[in-house]
A protein has these predicted regions:
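Alpha-helical transmembrane segments of multi-pass membrane proteins
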Residues: 1-232, 243-251, 259-264, 275, ...
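A short loop-to-beta-strand scaffold at the N-terminal edge of the catalytic core in hydrolase folds
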Residues: 235-241
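Short beta-strand "acidic-cap" motif of Rossmann-like dinucleotide-binding folds
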Residues: 322
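Short alpha-helix immediately C-terminal to the canonical SAM-binding loop
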Residues: 330-331
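Periplasmic c-type cytochrome electron-transfer domains
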Residues: 255
């Protein structure tokens, strides 16, 4: 194997591994949420797969690893990447008993999706080293360069996915693209080298088999495997909106971010409050409103904008500001959740702490309503004593 081929293979294989690792959080979010436990499980499972793959790849290399073996491993990595898509459905959570401890369930569900491709792609570098080494006197330089290109691929895959690919294509198309890339790379890497006399004929069987495999996979996955089930997939959430009819005939809509419903709204009646805690808050604000000529309220987290809409309807003179980190959530509220496009509510699409520290210095509020959630918990940086002091100074 030539150095250029070796560097290309390890670069793309490692980039694919990190692409899958980054999208894992978004793939799993609708089923188990995104928390410290989720990301700990993802990182641990992927690293375990890479470690086991490095070991097994070394064993295969010593037993006579060939280009065909390398090609099969890459194709296997592509196929197990494709397998993520049909598995990542609401039925995924039924594969691990609900009686298992929560953290163990998260680890096992993560492993079901991402351990196999991580393991197979971890086998690539040791095999490439074996296929590239021709002179033991250059072992250090060859191994060093191969692992440098491998690490560079991981870096590029990380930044490219987090900053560009998810926003541009969505997670399922990314996983599908990784699968196609790996299958194509496996076919190319496993094919016999061109002969000077035979030209392309020596590769025709492998190329034909690879193209047929790609066509079959395209047919299977383009039918329904690329459908995420999200109304909108953002950099932060899988956003879903669904309608429900109450026993009194009232039609309401629910805004679901990942696997947590953030609010129910009536499109016709902005004063409708579905949750008891919001009705309690409304009663407290009513007492506050009688003592305040013009209510000035700040909401940390917009969600379904349920309570901001309520205040806008009940207190026409109120000044209402919302810090909502995800602009796509705000757009969804305009489109689907009844937020008036001519609303007086002022929205800052930024992190709540940054909004307070950088944009609201010197302002005062009658009410600060904390409604920011990341999965089932309040983001840590919004729970610190320092942040509480900043709130008190508003």
């Amino acid at each position: 194997m030539t150095p250029v081929t070796a560097y290309t293979v390890v670069f793309l294989a490692s980039a694919s591994t990190l692409v899958l690792e980054i999208v894992a959080g978004r793939i799993l979010a609708p089923f188990i949420g995104v928390s410290l436990y989720t990301w700990t499980s993802i990182i641990g499972v992927v690293l375990s797969g890479i470690s086991a793959g490095n070991y097994l790849g070394g064993v295969l290399a010593d037993r006579g690893g060939s280009r065909r073996v390398l090609g099969l491993i890459l194709v296997g990595g592509g196929l197990t990447s494709f397998a993520i898509l049909p598995l990542a459905t609401p039925g995924l959570t039924t594969l691990v008993p609900a009686t298992y401890p929560g953290v163990l369930r998260i680890v096992l569900l993560t492993a079901l999706l991402f351990l196999a491709p991580s393991l197979l792609l971890g086998m690539v570098s040791p095999l490439v080293v074996k296929l590239t080494l021709a002179d033991l006197g250059r072992t250090g330089r060859v191994v060093g360069r191969i692992y440098a290109w491998s690490t560079l691929g991981s870096i590029v895959g990380t930044f490219l996915t987090g900053f560009l690919l998810i926003s541009a294509f969505g997670t399922r198309r990314i996983v599908f693209g990784v699968g196609l890339l790996l299958v194509g790379l496996g076919v190319a890497a496993g094919a016999r080298p061109l002969r000077r006399q035979g030209r392309l004929s020596s590769r025709k069987p492998e190329i034909a088999e690879g193209l047929l495999l790609l066509l079959v996979l395209l047919q299977i996955h383009l039918r329904d495997g690329l459908q995420s089930g999200c109304y909108r997939e953002t950099d932060y959430y899988c956003v879903k909106v669904h309608a429900e009819r109450l026993s009194d005939g009232r039609l309401i809509r629910a805004l679901e971010l990942d696997h947590l419903i953030h609010g129910y709204n009536s499109l016709e009646d902005p004063t409708y409050l579905h949750y008891g805690y919001l009705r309690t808050a409304a009663a407290l604000v009513d007492r506050l409103g009688t003592r305040t000529p013009r209510l000035h309220a700040l909401f940390l987290g917009g969600g379904a904008y349920t309570f901001p809409r309520y205040l806008e309807a009940v207190y026409p003179d109120a000044v209402i500001e919302v810090s909502e980190i995800d602009p796509a959530v705000t757009r969804t509220n305009f489109e689907m959740m009844g937020l008036d496009r001519h609303t007086r509510i002022v929205t800052y699409n930024a992190d709540a702490r940054q909004v307070i520290e950088r944009m609201l210095t010197g302002r005062t509020y009658d009410l600060v309503f904390g409604d920011a959630f990341n999965d089932l918990q309040v983001p840590y940086h919004l729970t610190t004593a320092e942040f509480a002091r900043e709130i008190r100074n508003l």
